[in-house]
A protein has these predicted regions:
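Fungal secretory targeting signals
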Residues: 1-21
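Catalytic cores of phosphodiester-bond hydrolases, prominently lipid phosphodiesterases
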Residues: 14-51, 60, 68-75, 82-313
Length: 313
């Protein structure tokens, strides 16, 4: 009884401030080692980040494009590009464009900067490394969807040229002889108005095509494999159907069959599946759709609320 009484008194008194506190001696060590060359970690920019299979939808809308998605572990990002007077500007529509928001300033240079940090010069490597943006999983590629908004051929030609800084350092996933794929830190996928015939017939390239997931059985796309389209995408509500309930199972039998058929067709050809225009509200319905898509094997979840999807994992 005496022991029990002492426990009750201790609980009522609240937690001991000393419990869990860092001893002053250790605090001193931590303070003195901060910034020390002995303790410095060369590739520490993303060392605590774990990549998750999430596409940062409309990424350019975020306060810090690319970096926000990176900080949440998103393995895929997106830029809508508009070609005016030889420059690729980034924005959802023309009224959102500014002279300073370009593909180079918001994506190419930031991605290049992160990759340089993850691949520092070192006495301990005999040749330049090709680590990806995540220190925790350096062989994980970053999918970079470039959504062409203006004239397809002219704009995509400018996109190919804009990739040169990444290309010259060997940071892009490449195709050789139309069949041999070499994975790189960044996998560029043209979408939107990207011309299919500027990708599919090209035997040696470092860019890919976002095939229409729901139309892979169309004769036009009969020969499309992962060599052309590592990821195929489609509108969830058009291809699967609108969500009218927020109970589990979230999909009807017909909707689930459509989903499985589309994913199976893609997977048989080495293509990953992605659905956009998934529900964002009610939250329960959104989460049930996410769970279903992951269970059925999509390669990327399309997400607007990155904090929510990161906490989901």
């Amino acid at each position: 009884m005496l022991f029990l009484a002492s426990v009750v008194v201790a609980l009522l008194a609240g937690p001991d401030p000393a419990i869990g506190a860092i001893p002053s001696s250790l605090q001193s060590i931590l303070k003195n080692t901060h910034g020390s060359t002995d303790y410095g970690y060369p590739t520490d920019l993303t060392r605590d980040l774990l990549p998750i299979p999430v596409h940062s939808h409309n990424d350019y809308w975020r306060d810090e494009p690319f970096y926000t998605g990176l900080s949440h572990g998103c393995t895929s990002t997106e830029a809508d590009v508009w070609l005016f007077n030889g420059t690729l500007y980034v924005g959802h529509d023309e009224s959102a464009l500014t002279e300073s928001r370009t593909l180079e300033s918001l994506y190419i240079n930031p991605i290049l900067d992160v990759l340089k940090r993850q691949n520092p010069e070192s006495l301990f490597v005999s040749s330049p490394t090709k680590n990806g943006v995540w220190d925790t999983v350096p062989d994980q590629t970053l999918y970079f969807f470039i959504d062409v908004k203006t004239s397809g051929p002219e704009t995509f030609k400018a996109v190919i040229a804009a990739l040169e800084p990444l290309r010259e350092r060997g940071y892009l996933t490449t195709v050789k002889d139309g069949k041999n794929v070499t994975n790189g830190p960044v996998t560029v996928i043209g979408t939107g108005e990207t011309p299919f015939d500027m990708v599919a017939p090209i035997k040696d390239r470092d860019y890919f095509f976002d095939a229409p997931l729901a139309d892979l059985n169309d004769p036009k796309y009969a020969d499309v494999t992962g060599v052309i389209s590592p990821v195929a995408s489609t509108d969830f509500q058009e291809a699967v159907g609108k969500i009218t309930v927020d109970t589990d199972p979230i999909l009807s039998d017909d909707q689930l069959k459509a989903l499985r058929d589309q994913i199976a067709t893609a997977n048989e050809r080495g293509i990953g599946a992605r659905y956009w225009n998934t529900p964002y509200f009610p939250i329960r319905a959104r989460n049930l759709v996410w769970r279903t898509l992951l269970r059925e094997g999509v390669i990327l979840l399309n997400a607007d609320d990155l904090a929510a999807v990161a906490s989901y994992f």
